[in-house]
């Protein structure tokens, strides 16, 4: 029996996932949470084999929770279920220790397949993520600069590229304005850009925003 914890800030999403997973005899939902702090608590209790977690949540985000969980419970399989396109976060989150990354728009059967795969200690690589990784290999060792950003830097980059202000981001991400400004400076330096408009142009030309 695979014990699964579900962490998502939307009650409807958690309810839908629980109903779907209850139809499979080899899976049992043993816990749920609505933010990163509760994800960490589920990991601490040790009642789950797989943590199915969103990355965009209030309080402590899934990004921060993943980092904390892998630091304290490296053997726990954390499967990211996100509404963001794979091109945005998949590679960075896999490097950070996620066992897999699947999009919320995927076929429901892919979720159960992913859970079974990561419960065996293996990585789950969806077809979309596999294509991204293959394109990276085909392109040689030189990766585009944005793929070298940390997950948090990538979050800040994409929000800036969409026109969000530092103040709004600080509030939405539960960070100080100074911290967000520091991330902005790092992103500009790593991408060798000078302004927010440069970030927007870069993101559009690389297909990261529309």
Regions found by a protein language model. Name each.
Residues 13, 58:
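The feature encodes the CheY-like receiver
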Residues 32-50:
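Acidic, metal-coordinating helix/loop segments flanking the phosphotransfer/catalytic sites
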Residues 35-38, 61-64, 85:
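Acidic catalytic/metal-coordinating carboxylates
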Residues 54, 82:
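Active-site residues of response regulator receiver
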Residues 165-198:
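Recognition helix of helix-turn-helix DNA-binding domains
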